[in-house]
Structures are given as structure tokens and as C-alpha cells.
């Protein structure tokens, strides 16, 4: 069932795009075998009946398939995008037209973004959600910091970025409109499942400080998410985004990737596969050694800035590309980010210079010495801002994990402490297994003797929890 709410309990760019969205959703379903298998397996038992899910995750065609899967399993859903540029408007229209409360369009302002996040939590019957499905942690942090402000709002007067200015302003609005709302709403949440590295890091920090208010399932570190979505997804979507944004010839160019985690590995492979000569920066000696042995030059951003043509940040950290770095670049260097937040690049510092908008999500910044850079998606996620994100097939694995996590939290959330958990190995293997037939993969089967020899069951799990893949 869907969250059939009051008329106009949604905001999308153009509801007439719904039919176009439905056609693409139908195509995506054929590429998302994990989610379709979840509907078949769990649909009859309705394990999410009674679940009231607030979802903050890129409102794409693939996410539409996830939303409709959650609803097919019994949930009521309200949704926003977790990035101002990542919505696919026809996907949002199709979901809204089907009766789901969704508040998202491509090109939101920061004020709208936080207003929509608040509206996602406002159920028509006055009750709140009992589950959160998050990507980056914004929905979770809205409740946590909002409750903090109910007892001491002084920090709201000290935003440290443009993003925080609008974030804190929205908290103030809700404090004025509904005193005590944050505490009440947070108390009703059984748990959160988190999609991405940045959001998971926030959750672990909260747990470490003893401030995590409910159980959390770290979907990002499921092997069938991080080793597939983060790596193989970026491997296909990064170059797609840069090409759509700039029409640049990759072959022969020097491309630099900051960070060599799973996202950085996929990004470097993407650029190298297009003929670019790739360099990498890293703080972790293990990842740096991996990059070197994968054939990439490893150097610092200070060294790379004047030498390379294309720059991609993929660290999950802040201030990776500073204004000084960008001023040192070649004329017309291309700058983009594939990490979750835009603070990997010092975009606010660039506001002091001349901006020329070339087309949506493509800007040229001119420095006083006449040199220019091309900035994609204002430093936000380039693969969703300048292209359509990861392909459906790889997102099927990620979103099947999300579905399993939501079922677990709904049925057994009260059995968990307020800590961060990962899904067990047998579910990781199950998600992978669901995607093999689509690729024509035939698994080898262990004999009883072989299984006993290595100490596993014939049907798995085949690796210990600590295995790194």
C-alpha cells in the first residue's frame, strides 16, 4: 500500500511527467532482480505492514523501484531526495502520481531542501515515522539536532556553512511551530538504515559519543553494496557525468582522483578505462600502496594541481580541493566531486570570483589572473547532478540490502541496542545470489567433503565475517 495522503501532499516539478517515469520504471524493474525477488518472496507475508518509513535518498528511477517495493511489502512511505541536484523529475512525478508523498525536484534551493525534509516527517494523521531510510544522514541529524535545540538552541545562532544556515533555520521554524515535536518524533523511531559512507561515519561518531538514539543498520558496508555500488557503479557513472557536462575527450588527458577507497577505485578505473592518464592522492598507506600497484601515480594535491586536466574528489572528507589548489590549476581544468557532500571542494570560497553559468550544473569560474575552471554540479555529487547516477542493476543490490534492513528493523528493532550493525553474511550472499541469473552465472557447488575440509556448510556462508573481498 502507498501513503495515500491528502490531495497535493507532494511537491514535484511537473506531474505530467508521470507516464514517462512509469515507462522508465518498468524498464528498470527488468534490471533490478533483487528487488523483484523481494516482492515475490515477502509480498504475501507483508513484513512491513505498519511500517511508516521516511526516506531521504536520491529520487531516481531506481529509487522509485525501491519505494514501490517497500510499499508492496506493506509499508507507508514519505520521501525526499538527499541532494538538491539528484532528483529525476519524471521519477518523482511517477511516484507522486501513484499516491506516495514525495517532495523533490532537480535544482532545489537549500531552503527548499530542508523544508522538504521537514515535510517528509509531517504525516497527515499527525503521527510520525517509525523507521528512517537515510542516505548521508540528513534525516537522522534533523531529528537529533532538533531535539538538542529544544533544550539549548544557542548553537543554531552559529552556523559554520551556507548549508548549516538553512539547516538551522528550518529547525528554528519547526521549534516555533511545534514545541516538543523533535523529541516526540525521535522517540517514535525504531531505527534507521543508512546507505552511504558519509552517513555511516556520522552514525559511528554518534555511537562513540553515546548519542545514537536508536539502532542503525549500516547498509553501506554490506559487501554487495560497497564493493559493487561504490566501485562498479562509479566505474560507469563518473565518466558518463563528466562527458555529459563537458563533452571533453578523456583519452590522453591527465585525470586526478582524491581518495582511493571503493568510490575512488571505481572512479580511477572509470577514467583509466576511457584512456585518461590517472593520478591518485591518499592519506592511508594501504590504499596508497593499492593505487600504486594498480598502476596509478600517487602524489599530493599540491603536486597535482598545476599538472592535471580533470580533478575528482572521492574522500568523504572536507577541504580536499582548496581555493589555492584551484587557482593553481591549468586554464579550463575540470573540477567535480563524487563524494556525498559538497564540502570536499571549497565551493564557498569560489563565490568571491566571477561565475558564468554554461548550462544547468555546469559553471565556469574565472580568477583575476584570467585562468578559468569548469565546476560541475557546484561540487555536489557529479554522477547524479550531471548524469543519472548508477545503473539499475548495481543499485538493485544496494536497495535489496536496504529492503532487508528495513524488514529487520521493523520486525526486530526492539531487540537491538542503540548501536550500528551490519547485515549478516548469509544475507549478503543471498543478495548476490539473486543477481546471478540475470548475468547467466553458474555457481560451482562444493561436495560434502570439500565443505567439511574448509569448515563451511555446502550452501554457505562461504567466508568468515572478517573476510575483506
UniProtKB/Swiss-Prot annotation:
Keywords carried by this UniProt record: Cytoplasm, Hydrolase, NAD, One-carbon metabolism
Enzyme class, first EC level, given as a word: hydrolase
Binding site for substrate: 60, 135, 195, 225, 229
CDD domains: SAHH
Reaction catalyzed: S-adenosyl-L-homocysteine + H2O = L-homocysteine + adenosine
Matching InterPro entries: Adenosylhomocyst_ase-like_sf, Adenosylhomocysteinase-like, Ado_hCys_hydrolase_NAD-bd, NAD(P)-bd_dom_sf, S-Ado-L-homoCys_hydrolase_CS
Pfam families: AdoHcyase (PF05221), AdoHcyase_NAD (PF00670)
SMART domains, A to Z: AdoHcyase (SM00996), AdoHcyase_NAD (SM00997)
UniProt GO cellular component terms: cytosol
Co-factor(s): NAD(+)
Subcellular location: Cytoplasm
Binding positions (NAD(+)): 196-198, 230, 259-264, 282, 317, 338-340, 383
Pathway(s) served: Amino-acid biosynthesis; L-homocysteine biosynthesis; L-homocysteine from S-adenosyl-L-homocysteine: step 1/1
Family per similarity comment: Belongs to the adenosylhomocysteinase family.
Annotated protein name in UniProt: Adenosylhomocysteinase
Amino acid at each position: 500500500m502507498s501513503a495515500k495522503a491528502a490531495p497535493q501532499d507532494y511537491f514535484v516539478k511537473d506531474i505530467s511527467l508521470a507516464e514517462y517515469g512509469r515507462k522508465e520504471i518498468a524498464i528498470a524493474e527488468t534490471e533490478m532482480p533483487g528487488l523483484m525477488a523481494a516482492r515475490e518472496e515477502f509480498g504475501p507475508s507483508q513484513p512491513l505492514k505498519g511500517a511508516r518509513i521516511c526516506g531521504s535518498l536520491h529520487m531516481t528511477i531506481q529509487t522509485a523501484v525501491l519505494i514501490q517495493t517497500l510499499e508492496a511489502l506493506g509499508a507507508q512511505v514519505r520521501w525526499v531526495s538527499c541532494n538538491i541536484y539528484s532528483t529525476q523529475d519524471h521519477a518523482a512525478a511517477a511516484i507522486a502520481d501513484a499516491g506516495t508523498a514525495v517532495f523533490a525536484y532537480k535544482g532545489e534551493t537549500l531552503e527548499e531542501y530542508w523544508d522538504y525534509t521537514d515535510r517528509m516527517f509531517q504525516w497527515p494523521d499527525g503521527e510520525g515515522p517509525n523507521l528512517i531510510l537515510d542516505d548521508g544522514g540528513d534525516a537522522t541529524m534533523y531529528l537529533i539536532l532538533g531535539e538538542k535545540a529544544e533544550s539549548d538552541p544557542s548553537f543554531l545562532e552559529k552556523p559554520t556553512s551556507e548549508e548549516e544556515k538553512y539547516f538551522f533555520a528550518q529547525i528554528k521554524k519547526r521549534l516555533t511551530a511545534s514545541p516538543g515535536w523533535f523529541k516526540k518524533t525521535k522517540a517514535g523511531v525504531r531505527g534507521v538504515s543508512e546507505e552511504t559512507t558519509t552517513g555511516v561515519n556520522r552514525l559511528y561518531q554518534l555511537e562513540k559519543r553515546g548519542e545514537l538514539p536508536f539502532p542503525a543498520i549500516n547498509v553501506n558496508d554490506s559487501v554487495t553494496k560497497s564493493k559493487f555500488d561504490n566501485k562498479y557503479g562509479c566505474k560507469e557513472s563518473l565518466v558518463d557525468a563528466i562527458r555529459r557536462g563537458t563533452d571533453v575527450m578523456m583519452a590522453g588527458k591527465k585525470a586526478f582522483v582524491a581518495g582511493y577507497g571503493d568510490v575512488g577505485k571505481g572512479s580511477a578505473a572509470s577514467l583509466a578505462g576511457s584512456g585518461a592518464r590517472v593520478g591518485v592522492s591518499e592519506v592511508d598507506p594501504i590504499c596508497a600502496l593499492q593505487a600504486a600497484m594498480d598502476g596509478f601515480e600517487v602524489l599530493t594535491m599540491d603536486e597535482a594541481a598545476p599538472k592535471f586536466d580533470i580533478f575528482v574528489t572521492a574522500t568523504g572528507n572536507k577541504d580536499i580541493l582548496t581555493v589555492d589548489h584551484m587557482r593553481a590549476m591549468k586554464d579550463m581544468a575540470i573540477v567535480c566531486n563524487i563524494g556525498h557532500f559538497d564540502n570536499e571542494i571549497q565551493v564557498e570560497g569560489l563565490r568571491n570570483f566571477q561565475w558564468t553559468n554554461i548550462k544547468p550544473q555546469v559553471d565556469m569560474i574565472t580568477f583575476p589572473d584570467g585562468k578559468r575552471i569548469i565546476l560541475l554540479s557546484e561540487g555536489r555529487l557529479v554522477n547524479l547532478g550531471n548524469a543519472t547516477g548508477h545503473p539499475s542493476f548495481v543499485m538493485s543490490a544496494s536497495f535489496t540490502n536496504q529492503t532487508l534492513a528495513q524488514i529487520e528493523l521493523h520486525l526486530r528493532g526492539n531487540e537491538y541496542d542503540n548501536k550500528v550493525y551490519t547485515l549478516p553474511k548469509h544475507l549478503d550472499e543471498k543478495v548476490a545470489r539473486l543477481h546471478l541469473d540475470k548475468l547467466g552465472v553458474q555457481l560451482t557447488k562444493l561436495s560434502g567433503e570439500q565443505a567439511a575440509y574448509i569448515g563451511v556448510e555446502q550452501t554457505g556462508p562461504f567466508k568468515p565475517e572478517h573476510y575483506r573481498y
